[in-house]
A protein has these predicted regions:
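Sensor-1/coupling segment of RecA-like P-loop NTPase cores
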Residues: 118-138
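Short beta->alpha connector loops at strand-helix junctions that form conserved
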Residues: 99, 129-130, 158-159
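P-loop NTPase motor domains
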Residues: 1-123, 206-227, 234-237, 241-258
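P-loop NTPase motor core of the ASCE superfamily
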Residues: 49, 113-116, 135-258
Length: 258
């Protein structure tokens, strides 16, 4: 590395410095530095079926996005190595990556490939994105398309405003037959009935945009679209426990750093 071409070396070090820039913040460094009795081994974490929560805001994650992405990528690579040693090359039980707002927090470089290949190794990936436009901005046009195409189940919510994407979704959902009956009266009182058929969108773009809160459209493999009623978390049977956990976590986040 020291003897490498100066231009190549500078380019590599620039990437390294950007990836590790978050560690210049003492708060970030303290958060990722384990104590004497706090080791973290990715393989042990996965084999013991651990659960890890990475919480951040869009503004707060900006400086540490590369560090968070590197951490998640390390877990994914460890999961792949574990899967390769198991029968059928699949993790059992599988690993769930619930990536809510991943486009804002830490866009994973490997997400397109993970969506395409992860399911075969027992890695279930569930990215939650604000829009297809956001995916194109965070990855690229081609990679955003790969993420969309590789999604086995797609849940579409209302509120989108990109006319191109809304029209594409309407086309993907499909069309239905619309029947129109007409009556024609002749000069001599004759009467004729006629029925015509035309193809119309099942859900026009404006209907998709105005889907009410709590309603989504599910596209599952090659099945017809499913209008889905989504259950809000306060209506779940474990809502009381979730409220208690949220209160406890918020108190922990407000606690002053030592």
């Amino acid at each position: 590395m020291i003897d490498a071409d100066p231009k190549t070396r500078d380019s590599i070090w620039q990437g390294v410095s950007l990836a590790l820039a978050a560690l210049a913040d003492p708060r970030v460094l303290d958060a990722v530095t384990p104590g004497p009795n706090e080791p973290f081994d990715p393989e042990t974490f996965l084999t013991q079926q651990g659960t890890l929560y990475l919480l951040a805001t869009g503004a707060g994650a900006g400086a540490s996005a590369a560090l968070v992405a590197a951490f998640v990528e390390d877990l994914i690579e460890t999961a792949r190595r574990l899967a390769a040693r198991l029968p059928g090359a699949r993790l059992d039980p599988p690993l769930l990556l619930a990536l809510d707002e991943i486009g804002n927090l830490a866009p994973l470089p490997s997400l397109p490939m993970l969506m395409a290949e992860g399911g075969g190794t027992g890695i279930t990936t569930m990215p939650v994105l604000q829009s297809l436009a956001q995916a194109r901005d965070r990855w690229s046009e081609h990679q955003a398309g790969a993420i969309w195409d590789a999604s086995i189940a797609k849940i579409i919510l209302g509120g989108a405003s990109n006319s191109r994407d809304l029209q594409d979704l309407s086309t993907l959902i499909g069309e239905r037959d619309e029947y129109t009956n007409s009556v024609t009266l002749g000069d001599r009182g004759t009467r004729s009935n006629q029925r015509s058929i035309r193809r119309v969108s099942i859900l026009p773009p404006d209907r998709i945009r105005t889907l009410p809160f709590g309603t989504g459209v599910t596209l599952l493999r090659s099945t017809p679209p499913i209008v889905t009623d989504l259950r809000a978390w306060p209506d779940r049977s474990d809502a009381a426990q979730l409220r208690s956990d949220r209160t406890e976590l918020e108190a922990l986040l407000r606690r002053p750093a030592p």
